[in-house]
Amino acid sequence: MSTTLPDIAVTEPSALHAPLRWVGMQDIAIPVRLDEAEPSGTVAARAQVQVDLPRPELKGIHMSRLYRLLDRHLEQPLSPAMLSQLLQAMIDSHADCGSRAARVSLAFEVMLRMPALRSEGLAGWRAYPVRIDAQSRAGRSEMRLQIDVLYASTCPCSAALSRQLLSKAFAQQHAGQTALRVEDVAQWLQRNGSYATPHSQRSVAQVRVDLVARVQSFDIRALVLLCESALATPVQAAVRRIDEQAFARLNGANLMYVEDAARRLRKELAERYASFHVAVRHFESLHAHDAVAETGSDADVFHMIAESHGQ
């Protein structure tokens, strides 16, 4: 009796002959070493690894080879160069399958410590969902970095309507008065400044950029800061009253429709990336539905409508 363990993926042909574009594994739990990750330098990630299967007669690929390669390469710090090496190793490991393409996806949250708006020495942690996609085909590698950034959006129309109500209330209460002291006006505003308030809401921008060849690092923090600077109203972590007041001022100075947010991001990204995509979503506090907008570079042409996930 043979003691050799059977491997039917190799010894048995496929009953249905057809090449497969991608075969592999997804949702693999694995630690990733990331120099930008605070405080430990390691993040818990979910990975996908796949190769093509062009030989139609083969029953399957060697999944364990892909897992071992992923595990071995992710012992190194994450970098574009390391992912390129992993992709080539995946293709080489499936030479007997005729594989010519491989792709990897990593999804994780990176924790970044961000300072408060005004309070000296005060800072807090914010979590940013990150996804990195890498693909190699015919000797050419492509990589994409995607992040989610949370921010606040205050409706310009609602702000205008609120100002109108406040103006009318002031005019009605001071009808017939030809002269008002500055102190009296200031006191009236202190009591009635919230006569009507515009609606605002937490919002999210999902930004994806294509990385150029030979880039040395993913530089996630730089992309986060670029997006938050463009939007001007990123959500905060640690706050005191002085920081909350500063945040209120930023929202008042940066009233935004969803279209405004998308265009702000487009302007900044277009100056630094040849190919990018932006999807913004405002979780409306006035409506029972969300407002969304998308934009991208000229190289970013067609996208299916994204599946909605309630939050």
UniProtKB/Swiss-Prot annotation:
It is an enzyme of class 3 (hydrolase). It catalyses: GTP + H2O = 7,8-dihydroneopterin 3'-triphosphate + formate + H(+). GO terms for molecular function: GTP cyclohydrolase activity; GTP cyclohydrolase I activity. Keywords: Hydrolase. Pathway: Cofactor biosynthesis; 7,8-dihydroneopterin triphosphate biosynthesis; 7,8-dihydroneopterin triphosphate from GTP: step 1/1. Its EC number is 3.5.4.16. The record marks 155 as: May be catalytically important. One of its GO terms (biological process) is tetrahydrofolate biosynthetic process. Converts GTP to 7,8-dihydroneopterin triphosphate. Belongs to the GTP cyclohydrolase IV family. This is GTP cyclohydrolase FolE2. It comes from Xanthomonas campestris pv. campestris (strain ATCC 33913 / DSM 3586 / NCPPB 528 / LMG 568 / P 25).
